[in-house]
Amino acid sequence: QGRIPSKANGMSRHIQLEANLSLTGANADERIALTPDQVKKALAYCFQYLKGFEENEQFHFPTSIIEKEENKVTIEDKIKKIASELKKAGRKALVVTGIDSAEAQLIAFAINEHLQSEAFSPQTPVLTRKGNVKALQQLLTDMNEGKVGALFINNLNPLYSLPNAEAFAAGLKKVPFSVSFAMRADETAQQTTLWAPQPHYLESWGDVEFKYGHYGLMQPCIRPLFNTRQWQDCFLQWVGHKESYYYFIKAHWEAHILKGFSWEQALHDGTFVKEDIKSFELPKEEKIPSLRKPPMTLTREESLRLISTVLPRELVETPFELSLYTSTALGDGQQANNPWLQELPDPIHRTTWDNFLTMHPTDAQTLGIENWHTVDGALDGHQAKISANDKSIIAPVLITPAQAEGSVGPRRESWLCRHAGDLRSSPGGPRRESWLCSHTGYLRSSPGSATYLWCTIGQVVLPL
């Protein structure tokens, strides 16, 4: 309230397009509720306006109407306005997308290149994710065909996190020797040949490369509290290296990164940036493969081809779209066995523990889904069943006015909380099992406190 972005006060104007109401969206200057597919189309539509294509070359957006006072404003009109604002901001503008779609990321890339955004530097991409889905699928195939002789797993729990965990479990049984480097005896560690307990990252040495040419050093806050050893030290000892991982890092940095700069100073600062970072070249395997030229040099035909991958001329509407999001408290679910995090209320919905589906009131009314408060302040309501391939999940439905129509939003990490029930009330005490994937029991709350979900009546199948 009272926020007026302008050049004078140095505030940036923020526009959010999303399906689920996020903290960022709730604080945006303008928020438009769209399904994930509509967000991709909005990006493409915005790009074609920035490129200045003729009217007869445009791909049209769905004619959904947004009611605003007495005026009817189409989503198409709103996207045109966004494109105009981006064009006016020029180099000071930035477009980012969190959609898990290569096409959407490419169009966002192209928009930023077209605007010559100062905040966008493709030569120094962030390296926070280095996963390779194709390589993982090949590993699963090789494991199940008996082609893997030894498997080392570091700080990962595939039997918990993979969507096709059954295939990994079957393949793991065919691997003669396997080791899991993990802090806990999780699902994967319990199935491998050996479990090598790891120290906490605050007890460990390490180094990182945030983006190309930008490095950081990780220093332990305390000595390991338990009888654990870093996986790097394990491998160094196995290959006959007598020095610890600390000296290995130091030698590597002095030879390949610092090149004359003081190790003690780098350790003191915690970070180090190469002086020749502006001329740093991307490795060939890291270059974006889908665009042979930088987007600024794309011809009209190439731009239209890129847009058409997301915004076809014939639009096919689906009944519902699944819009997964990450829990603020649990993140990717690695700490799902922490009851304090399970008890932390969601900052938007005020819910704790159980997972749920967010749904727009109009969709809920169409399906006959309702929520109601009981006399003790708890929230009750209907459940919905979501099926994909041969799997299905059942979850309570939380009716959310800010949800985009035609979409439902479950948290992505909470369907697989198998080890989250490993909570002990006292040292050596009995294990308390909790069914976090569907129900946690009738949890009551006093009026005005966090809302606990417990849905017992009815079931609706959503056609995704």
Task: Give the positions of each predicted feature.
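Long, well-ordered, tryptophan-enriched scaffold segments
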Residues: 2-92, 98-99, 110, 235, ...
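A cross-kingdom feature strongest in bacterial/archaeal respiratory oxidoreductases
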Residues: 1-27, 124-129, 137-225, 253-426, ...
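Structural alpha-beta junctions
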Residues: 4, 112-121, 173-177, 238, ...
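Short hydrophobic/aromatic-enriched beta-strand-loop microsegments
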Residues: 32-35, 117-120, 195-200
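Non-catalytic, well-ordered alpha-helical segments in soluble enzyme domains
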Residues: 229-254
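Anionic-ligand anchoring segments at beta-strand to alpha-helix junctions in alpha/beta enzyme folds, i.e.
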Residues: 106-138
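Periplasmic-binding protein-like
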Residues: 92-98, 150-155
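Gly/Ser/Thr-rich loops at beta-strand to alpha-helix junctions
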Residues: 99-104, 157-159
